[in-house]
Amino acid sequence: MSALRLRKVDALLAQATRALGAGRRLGFSSRGQHAELSLLPLLEDARIPADGVWLNTAVGPLLLSDAEALLSLLGEVPFTLGGEHQGWYWQLFNQRLSPVVADLLAPVAPFSDTPTELAIGCRVHVRLGSERLDTRLHAAPATLLRLLGSADWQVLNRNLDESWSVSTPLIVGELSLTREQIASLRPGDVVLPARCRFDSAGQGSVTLAGRQWAARTDQQAQHLFLQLSHEEHSHHEY
């Protein structure tokens, strides 16, 4: 059997992926309407889009696909990449960004260079009134971490699929037997464990995920329920 070889992952990339998690949501207002900006994990093709545009921001360079539509929803001045942009246009655009977005990204400015460091991608979803937009954002892991840490983002939680299950042995007791003793056992023999994990009332302990959990068993309608509790967590029933 060959040894399991795990893919090496850059430490900052792993940290940024964990920080993004199932996604983040940021509320803001634009054009007198409530809006939401969501960053979500990019589960499909994560390659950098050829039509993406690099822009410099307060948190670092960001590559945006469909940048004109995205940035136009984040403020009151339509964003365009056409023509020659003069300094006054960028100043006006940044001044008319939503205050929440401006605190996060401003000043937004052209970025002529293409970063050579590794980039991580995520989906971007914007909701403004009846308008919806889905696009993509790519950035260096350190930049994404600054982006996630520079505003009051709401952490999104993904509901666990009820069909997903984890199997783990439930050890109720332990006993050491020699090979000869095991060979001498016959059907109907009663074996008493030398160390019991549960008492006769169904109280005991379970080691799960590297932690020691207080456990209590309960039987209802021919089903055995196991209640686990930990001082850092609320009760969990299975």
Curated annotation (Swiss-Prot):
One of its GO terms (cellular component) is plasma membrane. Residues 66-238 are annotated as: HrcQa-C. The keyword Nucleotide-binding does not apply. It is a peripheral membrane protein. Keywords: Cell inner membrane, Cell membrane, Membrane, Virulence. Its main location: membrane. It is found in: Cell inner membrane. The HrcQa-C domain interacts with the hrcQb C-terminal domain. Component of the type III secretion system, which is required for effector protein delivery, parasitism, and pathogenicity. Probably participates in the formation of a C-ring-like assembly along with hrcQb. Interacts with hrcQb. This is Type III secretion protein hrcQa. It comes from Pseudomonas syringae pv. syringae.
